[in-house]
Amino acid sequence: MKPTRFLFTLGVAAWGCAILAAQTAPKSPTPKAPPPKAAAPAVPAVGTAPATATDQNAVVKRYCVGCHNDKMKTGGLSLEKFDANHASADAEVGEAMIRKLQAGLMPPPGGPRPAPDVHAALVKALETDIDTAAGAKPHPGARVFQRLNRPEYANAIKDLLLLDVDAGDWLPLDQKSANFDNIADAQALSPTLLESYLNAAAAISRMAIGDRNAVPVDSTYTNAGYVSQHPWDHIDGTPFGTRGGMVVNHVFPADGEYVFEVTLQSGANARFEDVDISIDDARVSLLEYETQPAGGADGRGAVHIKTDPIFVRAGQKSVAAAFVKKAEGPYEDLIRPHDWSYAGGGSGGPGITTLPHLRDVIIKGPYHVTGLSETPSRAKIFSCRPTLQAEERPCAKQIAAKLGAEAYRRPLANDEIDRLLPFFDDGAKKGGFEVGVRTMVEAILASPHFIFRLEREPAETVNAKAGAYRVSDVDLASRLSFFLWGEPPDQELLALATQNKLSAPGMIEKQAKRMLADPRAEALSTRFAAQWLRLQDVDKVHPDPNFYPNFDDNLAADMRRETELFFNSIVREDRSALDLFRADYTFANERLARHYGIPGVSGNQFRKVQYPDDTRRGLLGQGAILVQTSLANRTSPVLRGKWVMEVLMGTPPPPPPPDVPVLDDTADNQGGRMLTTRERMEIHRKNPTCNACHRFMDPIGLALDNFDVTGKWRQRENGQPLDTRGDFYDGSKVSTPHELLDALMKRPEPLLRMFTENLFAYALGRRAEYFDQPTIRAITKAAAASDYKMSSFIMGVIKSDAFQMKSYQPTSSQ
């Protein structure tokens, strides 16, 4: 192993061992001493206790203990010994009750239920006692550490070195907890993961500074088969007057000559094409593609064409390869008269042409290296330029201080700067000043201070081994920035933090408003909302093309983007969080609007559009939600009902008992007639074991059954009229999406609480525990004053004790 590499490995391994030891500590110990008083207490004021404690215990005994007793323990819960007068004594059980009662799920329909005022009084009594105890002794919770996940790592590199990288080239897939990839308890460490960070540091430092000794390599970029190649589709980033193709960000390591090769796939009768190769929007070559025999030039259906050597200067550049448009105007695809995007790969038969598919772009080089031109990355790194050998080490020290402070998200102490200089010395001995700086940059990127978000505990808290404390302004800046932007703090935020001004009254709110107005706040939609709403699950469903020929991965991507833009608009315009469920508009391009039956939308650009009727509203009318809760060949009211209960309401049904047959085992026809999904479900629900949960889920899912597998509106299934009638668990009749929305809006508290809980967990990088529920309730109740504006929830999380404070976290002695 090389000496420098050994130092990297040794340093990171030592930190890794310390953090691994810390991971064995209890997740969130209750602090033994009360913390300093928070500037904005995150627990509600004490309310008036409803009725008497004896009355509340009588309600629990009459309506709950019959099932939730020591013998039956329905749902794993016994309330025989639970005292509603002192719910805070067993807050975990109390919170479980509140969640079910507030949603109206308990007592279950069909059995005796208390009067609405009695039901509400019980919920309020439980909340009041738990919230009162929490107000007397706040528990901000704790986490051991967080490390940068893939998106955060890529954003940090972009800010630090002005490079767009795909962190997935080096880092393994992020594990999720509570459906988020930034939750600390899922961010396990391993030697393989640490090695991945080291490999990333080595590669990225070389990309940023360049390499005068670069040797020719082949870099291959592959275009997914579903990417559109149709004559009417223009790919963003490609020149105007082109169609299809692909765009890649490629780092050219040095000034020199490069060869660009493209791989095309098509049938035997593909038409002649011209392929435009451009760098940063400037054409550098025009390649001619000619029809090939069946099987392609390489016998595997592929044709390879390449440019002559082209001189390119060092740095990251946008490389585009696209087909030149042959004509303008309407087209008709006779091969696949649907919305499929990929017509190449097979012969259309005599007299019919097919469209080729641009599969790969291969960049080869550099050849005949002539030097290194100035790049944005080099300009950022080299804040000084020594002219004498004696100036090299002082210059390296200046670079270490400046770059290190930005990478570590805090100022560096002198001894920390001094510890980076041996890496410069080692590299400079081998290759001069620039190699020394590159080696030092590699050390910075491999440092635990860059990879991990480590928060320092005050000495008095460590010595006392107990209590809670306010996090430093520097750590608070990182919490705020990674929450709202998904990336490190910018210069303004970091400057305030290093001067200890961020915690001044009103300052964090002022900064949060500034950051929410910044385009980078879109991370709340692409990162938070996308994970909360399980948008990644859309890719797990592949509607059967025999039944749904108009659906493809392009449309799936449009649906995901629709939901992201929709959520972002609510944040940006500071609308009510209830608009997530009741909005009468969405964002669509021409294809998605056509799929939904919305007229008057042309072009590939997304824009805000009004729904023409009330069949669609909010999230439950959007394709990304409807597709992910379907199966390949039919809708699934069960999955849709379960999704609403779990994701939106926070009351997931229990898993099915073992050995219970699935719905697909139920006969799909009867008397020579195909059964509808509802008819098969009714047969399935005759099993009492199944009915216990399906009576909650099924009416929700059936109310959405007018949306087919792809989210398209329909009136019939298997030739039979749809029957979507059902009874919501509060007794409301629901048979349409609009009636389901009305039923949900009658009791919006579970929806708002679950939204707050997910926002809270994402912001803090840890699961929301039972002791966090008073804070979550306080945020939700406070938001009511503004009609639940989105900013009220975001500011409520930011101002909470849980966000600004931390409980002491003991490390393991092992």
Language model regions located:
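Sec-dependent N-terminal signal peptides
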Residues: M1-Q23
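Active-site-proximal, well-structured secondary-structure segments within enzyme catalytic domains
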Residues: N223-S228, D233, A557
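Long, His/Glu/Asp-enriched segments that create or flank divalent metal/ion-associated functional microenvironments
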Residues: D236-T242, M246-G267, F272-D281, L286, ...
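Aromatic- and Gly/Pro-enriched helix-to-coil junctions and flexible linker segments
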Residues: L20-G225, D236, A322-L388, K397-P422, ...
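A conserved hydrophobic secondary-structure block that centers on an alpha-helix together
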Residues: P231-S318, A322-A343, F382-M440, P448
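Short, intrinsically disordered, low-complexity terminal/loop segments
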Residues: K2, P108, S813-Q814
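Histidine-centered active-site/metal-ligand motif
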Residues: H68, K317, H694
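Long, contiguous hydrophobic alpha-helical segments, chiefly transmembrane helices and signal peptides
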Residues: V59-V60, C64-C67, L77-F82, G94-M97, ...
